[in-house]
Amino acid sequence: MNIKASEIAAVLKEEIKNYKADFTPNEVGVVVEVGDGIARIIGLPHVMANEMILFESGAVGLAFNLEEETIGAIVLGDYYGIKEGSKVSRLKRILEVPVGDALLGRVVNPLGVPIDGHGEITTDKRRVIEFPAPGIADRQAVKQPLQTGIKAIDSMTPIGRGQRQLIIGDRGTGKTSIALDAIINQKGTGVICIYVAIGQKASTVAGVVDTLRQHGALEYTIVVAATAADSAPLQYIAPYGGCAMAEYFMYEQKKDTLIIYDDLTKQANAYRQISLLLRRPPGREAFPGDVFYLHSRLLERAAKLSDELGGGSLTALPIIETQDNEVSAYIPTNVISITDGQIYLLTSLFMSGVRPAIDVGISVSRVGGNAQTKAMKKVAGTLRLDLASYRSLEAFSQLGIGLDKATLAQLDRGAKMVELLKQKQYSPIPFEEQVVVIFAATKGFLDNIEVDRVHEFEWRLLQYMRADKQNILDDIREKKDIEDMDGLYKIIEEFKSKF
């Protein structure tokens, strides 16, 4: 075979002539300072706010502060492998978390990585953690109840599907217990639950997971945990990650979802720490100026979607921890103004044995009343006012002034009502049974029963109804109404005569 040099040269010239360089320039930055979950970087002139960046160590971060010369980034996860001089590159995307049915029953960190030791989570579905809240046209009125199984809440401060109801109180007043009761009570209702633990001890989170497992609630629940041992950036993004997981079920599967943020005080503290480390100007209580937006953009994502979007819902129960019952502090007042009502737990009530320790006077539900069933409205209509007047009369009676018979009778009925509304932890009561019990109390059937026998009366009444009058309970549950008030009165009267 005879190959001529001129032919080779001609082929090479043709190839060179037609060659087009195809390359993508890649911006690279350098870490100049790192510590406490924060990295300061030079370079990356075109990086966007909240864009993901990749460190040489394999850690992922978010571009948080965009300054003239440097970028302030938060590191998501372990920042100990990042050193001064480490290379950083852009990922050109915003933070996403895995979502879907595969996460149900699992414990994950805010990035969706499993931390329960039960293997990898296999899902190809992902959602961005920062998603716009639905607009007015995409929502509909809250009109369907979300039963918590707690008598005091379902009767006086009812929660509707799509509502945001704040649980607020001092440390150790039973805030988490109320949230867990609400999750346990969703068994069999088709509601998907997400529990977001922010800044709690790992042992506390393990206890919560164990409680949910014991009550068969873990199978429809996702636990998102950013524990006290995790860095401030992870605690900051935890609620948004949990919300994205809940939104998948609301938007894609058209389901009702319930999310617990336990608690947003610790998230605000983590955000304050990040902001101060990044030299953002401090405001009231050293929080940055946009701390209101931190919570408003999260809680506005809770909604009851319009029928055109499938009619799914996201109900949010944020928890706020107060110091010495100080409800007028900065973060509590912010979240109170964002939410649709609050359940206020009082230390003095908790210590005196009233559990759940709900202060009826200051607790309110602004939209849940529209979602309350007709049956509960009929029996619990005056309950809040009666209990509030009982509290004021009780304070007045401490003075030792002689009281008339009517006032004494009101005090006696109020004390029995308070006793009736006490409830054991993790023992939610079905809605129809709550209706019967509260009906009996408001109609005066407890008047000649001693206070220490109120719970015995309640227990025996429910046993009697389940055994002999189950059809009445079924009717109330299906119709959400009491059609024959006189008939129910006679049934309880008949039971009372044998008690």
Swiss-Prot record:
GO cellular component term, pick one: proton-transporting ATP synthase complex
Q: Where is this site: Required for activity?
A: S363
Q: Which family does it belong to?
A: Belongs to the ATPase alpha/beta chains family.
User: What keywords were assigned to this record?
Assistant: ATP synthesis, ATP-binding, Cell inner membrane, Cell membrane, CF(1), Hydrogen ion transport, Ion transport, Membrane, Nucleotide-binding, Translocase, Transport
Function summary = Produces ATP from ADP in the presence of a proton gradient across the membrane. The alpha chain is a regulatory subunit.
**Which NCBIfam families does its entry note?**
atpA, PRK13343.1
Q: What is its main location?
A: membrane
| A GO MF label | proton-transporting ATP synthase activity, rotational mechanism
Summarize the subunit comment: F-type ATPases have 2 components, CF(1) - the catalytic core - and CF(0) - the membrane proton channel. CF(1) has five subunits: alpha(3), beta(3), gamma(1), delta(1), epsilon(1). CF(0) has three main subunits: a(1), b(2) and c(9-12). The alpha and beta chains form an alternating ring which encloses part of the gamma chain. CF(1) is attached to CF(0) by a central stalk formed by the gamma and epsilon chains, while a peripheral stalk is formed by the delta and b chains.
Which EC class does it fall in?
translocase
Q: Which SUPFAM superfamilies match?
A: C-terminal domain of alpha and beta subunits of F1 ATP synthase, N-terminal domain of alpha and beta subunits of F1 ATP synthase, P-loop containing nucleoside triphosphate hydrolases
Which E.C. number(s) belong to this protein? Answer: 7.1.2.2
User: Which residues are ATP-binding?
Assistant: G169, D170, R171, G172, T173, G174, K175, T176
Looking up PROSITE patterns in the UniProt record yields: ATPASE_ALPHA_BETA (PS00152)
State the protein's name: ATP synthase subunit alpha
Enumerate the subcellular locations listed in this protein's record, separating them with semicolons: Cell inner membrane
Record's bilayer topology term: Peripheral membrane protein
Q: Name one Pfam family in it.
A: ATP-synt_ab_C
Reactions catalysed according to its record: ATP + H2O + 4 H(+)(in) = ADP + phosphate + 5 H(+)(out)
